[in-house]
């Protein structure tokens, strides 16, 4: 579930050596499954361990994860990196904002996961987003653009060369195309 590099493990052991005996770490997600999700690591003294915590054993310490955070920490990695500017602990949790869906989930759930975890973060740099409206019987994903994408002069290129290409590669036997149903209104909100 959570991978902690050897350098990060050594860093945690060093930090925990200054704490009361029996103290471990807690890895958590605040507001999991939302766009505001934030991950964190804190000390976890013995009296803060909950009955529904999942405990992961590492070299010299354990990591506790609460039941609510657990599904959002799938594939999370913690590393301790050093460069010219100094050292820092990095925590990457690709599923923190949206729970990873299983391979047998419905097509719309799997497409929605890709939209939220991969496509919308890219569109967010232009203040835009898309949402899945429906999937037609013909296998066409009907999308609606929002934010800076609404009225953008590049929306057709984004749709055909970006989003449609990506979704067709990921769901080749299930999707046949992508359609935009947005009533585009160019305005101050539009990118470009």
Swiss-Prot record:
Pfam families: Fe-S_biosyn (PF01521), NifU (PF01106)
Annotated residues for binding of [4Fe-4S] cluster: 149, 152
Any one of the GO BP annotations: protein maturation
Domain of life: Bacteria
GO terms for MF: 4 iron, 4 sulfur cluster binding; iron ion binding
Presence of the UniProt keyword GTP-binding in the record: no
Protein name: Fe/S biogenesis protein NfuA
């Amino acid at each position: 579930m959570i991978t902690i590099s050897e350098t990060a493990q050594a860093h945690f052991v060093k930090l925990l050596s200054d704490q009361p005996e029996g103290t471990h770490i807690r890895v958590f997600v605040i507001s999991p499954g939302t766009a505001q999700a934030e991950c964190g690591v804190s000390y976890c003294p013995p009296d803060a361990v909950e009955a529904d915590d999942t405990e992961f054993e590492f070299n010299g310490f354990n990591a506790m994860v609460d039941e609510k955070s657990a599904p959002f920490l799938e594939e999370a990695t913690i590393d301790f990196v050093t460069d010219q500017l100094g050292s820092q602990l990095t925590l990457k949790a690709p599923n923190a904002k949206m729970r990873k869906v299983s391979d047998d989930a419905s097509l719309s759930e799997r497409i929605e996961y890709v939209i939220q975890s991969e496509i919308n973060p890219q569109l967010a740099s232009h203040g835009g987003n898309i949402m899945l409206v429906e999937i037609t019987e013909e296998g066409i994903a009907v999308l609606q653009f929002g934010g800076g994408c609404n009225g953008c002069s590049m929306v057709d290129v984004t749709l055909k060369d970006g989003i449609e290409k990506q979704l067709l590669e990921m769901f080749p036997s299930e999707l046949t195309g992508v359609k935009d149903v947005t009533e585009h209104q160019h305005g101050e909100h539009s990118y470009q």
